[in-house]
């Protein structure tokens, strides 16, 4: 991506985020923090981040949202945190303990990690099951379309590959996603998490 293309992407993101700022903040404030940082500090981010944010906002305008599932994923990872008057965050309850330098501890997701989880879990689409209305009972996630077919509300993102730089808790986040699918996710889900050292 050339510098000119990055500037065009930045201008486009600035424009679309201004229209969707309230919608994004209502989903999760850290999602808004990440997207706003892309706009205010574009030199700290690469062009693919800008394009990914533009695409996410377009998908958010186009498809159904499943904020409940997204918030469940975030809660199971980190639990509930509270910010003190001094600005420090303290863990209150819930969430999983993760391996840390001083033993098992709770971690709060960073804004870019919240964006990753939102892209995976927040968007849903109506999919034609190729069954006609009346051919069977409807499941709780289904409805009858205007064409007389049964449609099911499913996650839009069904395949996801995460590439991030070193020291961004990618192995920990990937392992958590596997855990979430095992405990709460779709049946027959397949998740693969690779690390380059056995102690990870």
Labelled PLM ranges:
Residues 1-200:
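Phosphate/NTP-binding elements of NTP-utilizing enzymes
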């Amino acid at each position: 991506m050339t510098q000119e293309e990055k500037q065009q992407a930045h201008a486009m993101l600035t424009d679309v985020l201004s229209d969707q700022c309230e919608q994004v903040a209502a989903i999760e404030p850290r999602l808004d923090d990440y997207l706003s940082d892309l706009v205010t500090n574009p030199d700290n981010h690469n062009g693919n981040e800008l394009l990914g944010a533009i695409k996410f906002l377009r998908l958010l305008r186009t498809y159904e949202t499943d904020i409940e599932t997204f918030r469940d994923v975030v809660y199971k990872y980190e639990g509930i945190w509270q910010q003190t008057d001094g600005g420090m965050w303290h863990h209150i309850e819930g969430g999983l303990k993760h391996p840390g330098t001083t033993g098992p501890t709770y971690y709060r997701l960073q804004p870019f990690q919240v964006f990753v989880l939102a892209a995976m879990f927040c968007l849903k689409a109506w999919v034609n099951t190729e069954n006609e209305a009346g051919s069977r009972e409807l499941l709780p996630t289904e409805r009858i379309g205007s064409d007389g077919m049964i449609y099911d509300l499913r996650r839009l993102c069904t395949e996801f590959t995460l590439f991030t730089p070193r020291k961004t808790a990618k192995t920990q986040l990937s392992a958590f996603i596997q855990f979430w699918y095992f405990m709460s996710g779709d049946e027959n889900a397949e998740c693969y998490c690779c690390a380059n050292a056995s102690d990870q």
